[in-house]
């Protein structure tokens, strides 16, 4: 099981120990997809303080860790899922909508669900007519949102970059990288 992985070698940031550190704002090795999303906010100098974000996902891989990372940046966070009532209304109130459903047959984020100028981060991946697509109707949302990530080519590469970053960090912690040993 994942709990058998040493927390200082946990480059995915998903061991119970690292998840616990994340929930207290002290994690060093953080889950890659949420970290990649936060890195995008930093790169584009998006001030998150006081913003309202809706995360459409409650998984241990994306939704829950992302909730904690956004809280660290003083974001008001609403977590939505398959049982959430009035999802459209929640999304329409949000400055940031992050969707990670990953099943286009069950959910598509459409432009009428997003307020003008919102930021849309699409983590979902589905196959449609032999193409990879996200949860968001990209073309219509692009006309309404201030930012929207594409699928493929948006969050996915950032996830890989954060995995590499965590690998270097773990190697440094374990004194196996650049220490001459």
Residue ranges and their predicted role:
Residues 27-119, 128-142:
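Glycine-rich phosphate/diphosphate-binding loop of Rossmann-like nucleotide-binding domains
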């Amino acid at each position: 099981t994942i709990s058998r992985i040493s927390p200082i070698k946990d480059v995915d940031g998903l061991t119970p120990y690292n998840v616990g550190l994340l929930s207290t704002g002290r994690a060093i090795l953080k889950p890659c997809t949420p970290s990649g999303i936060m890195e995008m906010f930093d790169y584009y100098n998006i001030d998150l303080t006081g913003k309202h974000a809706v995360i459409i996902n409650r998984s241990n891989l994306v939704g829950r860790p992302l909730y904690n990372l956004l809280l660290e940046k003083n974001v008001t966070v609403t977590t939505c899922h398959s049982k959430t009532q009035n999802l459209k209304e929640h999304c329409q109130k949000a400055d940031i909508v992050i969707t990670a459903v990953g099943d286009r047959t069950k959910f598509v984020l459409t432009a009428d669900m997003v307020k003008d100028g919102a930021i849309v981060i699409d983590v979902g991946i589905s196959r449609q007519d032999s193409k990879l697509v996200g949860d968001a109707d990209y073309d219509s949302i692009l006309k309404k949102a201030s930012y929207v990530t594409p699928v493929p080519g948006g969050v996915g590469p950032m996830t890989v970059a954060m995995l590499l970053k965590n690998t270097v960090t773990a190697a440094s912690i374990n004194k196996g990288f650049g220490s001459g040993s």
